[in-house]
Amino acid sequence: MPFFGICYGFQWATVEFARNVCGLDGADSTEVDENAPHKVIYKLRDLLGVDDLGGTMRLGRYECELAKGSIAERIYGTSLISERHRHRFEFNCLYEKELAEKGMRVSGRSPDGKFVEIAEMPSHPWFVAVQFHPEFQSKPIKPHPLFASFVEAAYRHKSGKLEHVGVKGSRVQVG
């Protein structure tokens, strides 16, 4: 079954993967448990100590570099994208290697390498989780590439034809 996690969905996908696949008991987000033994998601480092509600977010449009050969790169058709953000918490890169060893790959990050923006599972036919908000750039007659690909994957899953992202012959036209 296709999975598409957006913002909080990205955060919980990584936490659940850490808990249930990597076996990290107590893996959590500091938004839920500040004393979690495995802080997979934590408050943005640049915002620690900032109490002004409006000043505690990563807000606006930011560039993201996509990993070569990733599901995301195939969907977007490019290796550099620009997406809009609205969040206070981020993925803790200390867990990147452990998650990757079990099958969850970081496939998009900020150009400075500081922020993880996209996680995916290459062994899964369609599993993409993003920290940003693609809905901010989607329109009824011009859907965002991630939504178009997700809907196509759901259609293919229902009809028993879902294999992997990047299958030619898409019924969904983007652009």
Label each region the model flagged.
Residues 1-63, 69-71, 140, 147-158, ...:
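Cysteine-nucleophile active-site neighborhood
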Residues 60-66, 85-90:
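Short, exposed beta-strand "edge-strand" segments with a Pro/Gly-rich flavor and a Y/T-containing core
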Residues 76-80:
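Short, glycine-/aromatic-enriched active-site segment of Class I SAM-dependent methyltransferases
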Residues 48, 52, 75, 122-126, ...:
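Alpha-helical context
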Residues 81-175:
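Acyltransferase
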Residues 71-74, 97:
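Surface-exposed charge patches
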